């Protein structure tokens, strides 16, 4: 047994298990000794910050909502920590996107015992990824359509009511109020983007994360890679996008906040298309950052796109 643990992999695995188990014990002990524990708020844990914000708007002050991934994090290939296991295990409900977004989550969830979960994209009609190794698989960035966000709201409301029925009235009321705010987003966004001439409406980005936004507002989508993964901005991908930009005289290209802007800037340099700046999609910023909420993320992204096209 000692010889086997000389393997670096096994030593790391053993250390991970010990740390996670110790943390769980410590957390449980603190809960036992805390007399106010029985009065604690219903706790929701989400896989990333956008779901956290939507859920907190519905939960209001009767539940606490935390995200496993931090603001600004790359969420596709996130590496969970023992602390994340403790956080999830202490939850009353876990909310996740599904559609192959959190490729780490299903394995992670195997470590969590007796905590219910809900997929917040249930009922959304997926748009398939068009090309590359993920061709035909559902594009997971469904929240980039405000109309889809209404489905997120309803799924989260149902999950909260099911698992915390004592506060059903609050959840129902807050969900309705927040849905009205989301509905109010569409008209001004549509009017702003409609100023861009139809022949110019090509949305060129690094990751193919804007399919739902592009469909809603009449853009053709071009991207350097379909989903943030190991191969980003390889020569064949870059050349393909450069050819499309030149052929269609596309005036502007963008990158995303959680990845390097170098590939997009390379394309801009080689084609003469303007580099339009950073779009936000996978993660919110901190409270003092530019996109601390889902609504601000949508507004900021559309504003950046419109300005990139001179609108």
From Swiss-Prot:
Cleaved signal peptide residues: 1-31
Subcellular localization(s) per the UniProt record: Periplasm
SUPFAM superfamilies per UniProt: Helical backbone' metal receptor
InterPro entries reported for this sequence: AdhesinB, Bact_metal-bind_prot9, Lipoprotein_PsaA-like, ZnuA-like
Keyword list, A-Z: Ion transport, Iron, Iron transport, Metal-binding, Periplasm, Signal, Transport
One of the GO biological process terms: cellular response to iron ion
Binding site for Fe(2+): 76, 141, 207, 282
Domain of life according to the entry: Bacteria
Membrane-crossing residue ranges in chain numbering: none
Subunit structure: Monomer.
Family: Belongs to the bacterial solute-binding protein 9 family.
Name used for this protein in its record: Iron-binding protein YfeA
Taxonomic lineage from the root: Bacteria, Pseudomonadati, Pseudomonadota, Gammaproteobacteria, Enterobacterales
